[in-house]
Amino acid sequence: MTKATQILQRFITLFLPIFLFPLFGCSSNNATDPAVVKAVAKEAYIFAYPMLENYKTMQAQALSGDSFNSFTHATHLQGPEYRDIVRPNNDTLYSTLWMDLRAEPLVVQIPSVTDRYYSFQMVDMYTHNFAYAGTRTTGTGARTFMVAGPNWKGTTPENVEDLFVSEGNFVLCLGRTAVNSDVAGDLERVLEIQQQYRVQPLSAYLGQTPPAPSSMNVFPPYEKDKAESVEFINLFNFLLGQVVIDPSEKEMIQRFGLIGIGPGYLFDASRLDDSVRNAMEEGIAEALEEIKNSGPLLGTEENAWTLTKRIFGNREQMQGQYLVRAGAAAMGIYGNDLEEAYYPSTQQDMHGAPLDASGGKSYALIFSREDLPRVKENGFWSITMYDLPDQFMVENPINRYSLGDRTN
């Protein structure tokens, strides 16, 4: 039996029902009113979309390789071969750490990094950037921080300088360490820094006996066709069972219960009446269309450039902006806060014509010395080209994928 087959079988086992599917036990006329069902399905899908996209990436990067709670370091700058996350950068080496916080917190130790930009971005299951460590937020000195899940009750060790608490059991800790590819030996320097990034369960850090592991070790599979149909509800319900629902959203989640949504609910699409299913599918289709066309919410247009608004942030910053959150996940999941990075982009020339180099056209982007992008100490700027609609880097004969302040 291949490893892939074992993983698939592990996924197919799924989870046992915890609650009955509420739609079919509901006496309210709303439960079968197509207009109401469609509206709820649309609202629920927009809310769920970034959580589904996050889980898709977690499945590809952590579940498939069973690599929770350990760093995976990129050893070279990303190019066209990298297709895990849209709009990757070609300026930093990624250090990816998927955290499973169900049993206990994780302690991360980072060395002093004084000669370049670095950051660790903590992303929860809602795709909120709930914490940062790095050059901008915690400085350039050595640092020890701890990330805990929503149900942890304990004491932070004295020598742990920062405690970050997640709203969910699973967290993406995404590290970025800048590389100057035009300087000989700089890549090797960053590889050395990466090896000093360390992560341990709290019990190991304290030299104590570890707690019992979580009894839940099966995960539903992400499948694109199901994730874009009424079947998304099964996965969404699983994810809701892994987070604390914010008080501001409890009433909304209860309203979603009209169509079978709730933490741990078992959803059985085969029991849907045709009229109800059709209404739900129409709502999902409209949600996907709104997400696809959410560009005006994500940025403003100026001189053919899209200037990004605040589309990533913590819960307070993103509260209630569910379509923005979904559109941002579709455009480029795991983007940074405005305070950390700024992402202007363009798909057209100064005359409004689409950028298209396939016909032999050439384009020039010109900065005067006075107009070069300004960055803070140890910051950087770059321009990267992506293909459309996939939003990945473009293969080219000279293997150059970005230009910026470090380009000779």
Predicted feature descriptions by range:
Residues 22-25:
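C-terminal motif of bacterial Sec signal peptides marking the signal peptidase cleavage site
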Residues 19-20, 53:
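Alpha-helical transmembrane segments and their juxtamembrane interfaces
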Residues 2-15:
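Bacterial N-terminal signal peptides that target proteins for export
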Residues 28-408:
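A compositional/structural signature for long, glycine/proline-rich flexible linkers
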